[in-house]
Amino acid sequence: MRSKTAANPERLARVLEGLRKYQEAPRAAPPPGAPAIAERMGAALRDYGGDGPDILFVPSLINPPTVLDLGDRSLLRWLAGRGRRVLLLDWGWPGEERHGLSVGGHVEEIMLPLMATLLQPPDLAGYCLGGTMAAAAAQLGGARSLATIAAPWRFHGFPDQERERLAGLWQGSKAVAERLGVLPMEALQVAFWSLDPERTVRKFEEFAGLQGDSAASFVALEDWANDGPPIGHAAARELFEDMFAADLPGSGQWQVGGKIIAPASLPCPLLNIVSTTDRIVPHSSAMTMGERIELARGHVGMVIGSKAQEELWQPLASWLSRVSPS
């Protein structure tokens, strides 16, 4: 932070004021969680209701799933009223039994068994790393359709400098992850803050002047970004070494359940929703196959921003109605 504001003491003061305001902001009670209809290894399949074919949303392992169900900006609750029964895979907290599960292992041991409890294959929608994982689940377990939202696949599409920075962070954290069995959330925060340090400074500078609903929305979003469980050691190793460093998915070498996972092998329609201004998951890292919707919103703003319903929710619902009708 100081390196970004060293030449501007007034800016530093605004940023610090924004941080203080965020820390002292009142928090509303979170909405009640949707009921769990199946559980496995600490993860739960949650039912948000709605009539029609099942659509299962798969969030990232890295942050809580609440970004998909954030107050009056809830994609899940909105879609439940539009001809779909909406389900969420809530990863929960990784207990010791999950410390040895790779990213692909979470697909094999958790996603596929939970999907098997449904009466028929669902539509799948995956956000961020959840989209990468949903692609494996769609190929191995079957799906009516697959929509990915800001999901990385071609990890060589991340700038070289960022991949090198993440490799260095993993090297510095690997011993701790091996000893604890998990990579703490704090280490993950450092990794992803480093992808866009200027934004981290700018958002608190701007928050210093926000009031009312805008300020409350900022607090809710930041609480989500700063919350979440650790990630198991094996999943962290695969994420940093096999994905960011070696790009096994993008080079056609990522195996889950002994099978190569490849977009060309998907048994269903595919939609990739990407943002051309996403600094966390650049659009150049997305799959190239399937249909594509491009937005000019941030990694999170595309899902919950003021234009999200118009630019993402409605186009997603329309696509589902076309390729996977009720």
Regions found by a protein language model. Name each.
Residues 1, 119, 133-231:
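Alpha/beta-hydrolase-fold enzymes
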Residues 30-95:
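Short, surface-exposed "cap/lid" segments of acyl-processing enzymes
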Residues 100-117:
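Alpha/beta-hydrolase active-site loop
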Residues 124-126, 149, 273:
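Short beta-strand immediately N-terminal to the catalytic nucleophile in serine-hydrolase-like folds
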Residues 125-134:
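Gly/Ala-rich beta-loop-alpha elbow adjacent to hydrolase catalytic centers
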Residues 266, 272-274, 278:
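Short beta-strand/loop motif that positions the catalytic acidic residue
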Residues 276-293:
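Conserved loop-alpha-helix segment in the C-terminal half of the alpha/beta-hydrolase fold
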Residues 280-283, 297-311:
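Catalytic histidine-centered segment of alpha/beta-hydrolase-like enzymes
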